From Swiss-Prot:
One of its GO terms (biological process) is chromatin organization. This is HMG1/2-like protein. The lineage of its organism: Eukaryota, Viridiplantae, Streptophyta, Embryophyta, Tracheophyta. It comes from Glycine max (Soybean). Residues 74-84 have a biased composition (Low complexity). Keywords: DNA-binding, Nucleus. Belongs to the HMGB family.
Length: 152
């Protein structure tokens, strides 16, 4: 059987040509993870939804009524159940507070974005980008020229 291959041999893929699909998928994900920018600590936090505004108050009441219950999940489940039973009229104050915080957040974000846009163009950062040795070298050059004149 010089020229022909058996059916089982022809069905098998050449191991040298095989592509590791799992490895290729993980390799594709890695660069995306590296490119993720670090979070800016000065960036304003997103405003809470009406439900989370409700949760702030509900948590205080629930903890007073059930001091022995330390599970976060129990508080969340109880709050969710109560929120579902509330009418739109009962939810209205929380929605209003949420909208107020949203307007404040948008104002803060405009100020933050304006500050970010102005930041890189500022002249102060150019001086701070110089290393300490570069600044010291400039000072030494100025002092050195003054010392040479004293010797004359």
């Amino acid at each position: 059987m010089k020229g022909g291959k058996s059916k089982t041999e022809s069905k098998r893929a050449d191991p040298k040509l095989a592509v590791n699909k799992k490895g290729a998928a993980t390799k594709a994900r890695k660069p995306a993870g590296k490119g993720k920018a670090a979070k800016d600590p000065n960036k304003p936090k997103r405003p809470p939804s009406a439900f989370f505004v409700f949760m702030e108050e509900f948590r205080k009441v629930f903890n007073k009524e059930h001091p022995e219950n330390k599970a976060v999940s129990a508080v969340g489940k109880a709050a969710g159940a109560k929120w579902k039973t509330m009418s739109d009229a009962e939810k209205a104050p929380y929605v209003a507070k949420s909208e107020k915080r949203k307007v404040e957040y948008e104002k803060n974000m405009r100020a933050y974005n304006k500050k970010q846009a102005e930041g890189p163009t500022g002249g102060d950062e150019e001086e701070s980008e110089k290393s300490v040795s570069e600044v010291n070298d400039e000072d030494d050059d100025e002092e050195g020229s003054g010392e040479e004149e004293d010797d004359d």
